[in-house]
Amino acid sequence: MENYTKSTTMCGKRKPTFEIYRESDFSKITNQGTVTAFDIISNKETFSESKQLKKAKSRNVTLVDKNTKADKRYKSEKLSDYLLNQEHHKNSPKIINDVLVIGKSDGLINSFPLSQNYISSSESQTSSGNVDIIGNDNSHASPYLPKFELKSQSQSNHSNVVKNQPIKLCKKTEGGTNLDHNKSINGAVKSGTSKSANKDRIYVFYEDEEVMEYRYIFGSRMQTKNHDINANNKRKIFYQNSFSNFHLLHKIIQPNYEPASAEERKLCIEILDEVLQY
């Protein structure tokens, strides 16, 4: 996990702790095996590197920022700032489309659509509707399991595939019905004709084992989580508000979403800060 949480310094400027990949390289990432929580995927170029820095790097020239001090500690650019900064990153992806779980244990790889709701099997929480337990037994299942709303199939956007198989891509029609479940992302990118092969997609990956250890999905990446009082309080709050948080998170990532009130806007910011913190 240390490889993903530590930033590397280059030419006096820190790189982001998360990496950006193009969707065409999606198959390489899924087979990599060690992808920790909240690693963001879209294209391989880290956006903290400017064109001037790239040219200097190719010429083996070290650039020093005139406005920086030797003792100044640099911070990585936040993903939220990166998504909102359209002037400097016109071609950057703007929407987080999906959250996926890469599980190390034998069983299924679970695709967590943000439009679904989740409950904790370890805390024996109950909720209205059917709960589909994924995996051969509860030990291989994530503590947050998708609740499939059978009455609203048009809103479902989940895809469960066997490990080491390509992640399946659901292509939506105008009516919202999911089609072509057998078309993999890799195949859609190669064909170049599929509408679902969107180059501006961002995929957020986290490990199933990490979720089981932290007991909640979206949280700060603190190494001393089990000994931190604030982290324990956040964990309890997330247990109580998991339904509303996931529902609101799904609304936040919509491009035309506007908060209905100041309280909702404040909650949106808190959730985004929690999800995008690294």
Curated annotation (Swiss-Prot):
Gene Ontology CC entries for this record: cytosol; nucleus
UniProt key word Ribosomal protein: no
BP term (GO), one: meiotic DNA double-strand break formation involved in reciprocal meiotic recombination
Disrupted-gene phenotype: Causes severe chromosome missegregation without greatly affecting sporulation itself. Reduces recombination by 16- to 76-fold.
Membrane-crossing residue ranges in chain numbering: none
Keywords per UniProt: Meiosis
Induction: Induced by transcription factor mei4.
Coiled-coil intervals: none
Summary of the function given for this chain in its UniProt record: Required for the formation of meiotic double-strand breaks and for the segregation of homologous centromeres during meiosis I. Interacts with the SFT and DSBC complexes, two subcomplexes involved in the formation of meiotic double-strand breaks. Stabilizes the SFT subcomplex on DSB sites and recruits the DSBC subcomplex onto DSB sites.
Oligomeric and partner information: Interacts with rec15; the interaction is direct. Interacts with the DSBC complex component rec14.
Name used for this protein in its record: Mei4-dependent protein 2
Organism: Schizosaccharomyces pombe (strain 972 / ATCC 24843)
Source taxonomy: Eukaryota, Fungi, Dikarya, Ascomycota, Taphrinomycotina
Gene: mde2
